[in-house]
Regions:
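Short terminal alpha-helical segments
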Residues: 1-39, 87-90, 94
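Short, structured coil/loop segments at alpha-helix boundaries
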Residues: 3, 29, 47, 63, ...
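Extended aliphatic helical segments
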Residues: 7, 14-17, 32, 36, ...
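Amphipathic alpha-helical interaction modules
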Residues: 20-64
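Amphipathic alpha-helical binding modules
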Residues: 64-97
Length: 97
């Protein structure tokens, strides 16, 4: 599964939140930003570089940050078990929203 499942879960999450207004994000954005940070950390690990803090931009930018982090993970060809774990993480975040 790996890549396909990760991309699918990311698409579902982005589809769920991309249209949200700033008011709708209130109280929900911290969990999604934390997910973006975990995705960024995994991408850094896969690329063999130091992890960095993902900038905290406007909440409405979070869907784009998810897209970028998932694209980085796919390009880095991370291990399938890690991608499956991250797909589960995205699924759990979706459920929590």
């Amino acid at each position: 599964m790996g890549t396909d499942q990760l991309v699918r879960q990311a698409e579902l999450l982005v589809g769920q939140v991309a249209h949200w207004t700033p008011a709708r994000w209130r109280g929900r954005s911290d969990g999604v930003h934390a997910l973006v940070q975990r995705l960024a950390d995994a991408a850094a690990e896969a690329e063999g570089r130091t992890a960095y803090a993902v900038p905290r931009l406007a909440d409405t930018v979070l869907p784009d940050q998810i897209r970028v982090m998932v694209a980085d993970l796919v390009a880095a060809e991370h291990r399938p078990d890690v991608l499956d774990r991250l797909a589960d993480d995205i699924r759990a975040t979706r459920s929590a929203l």
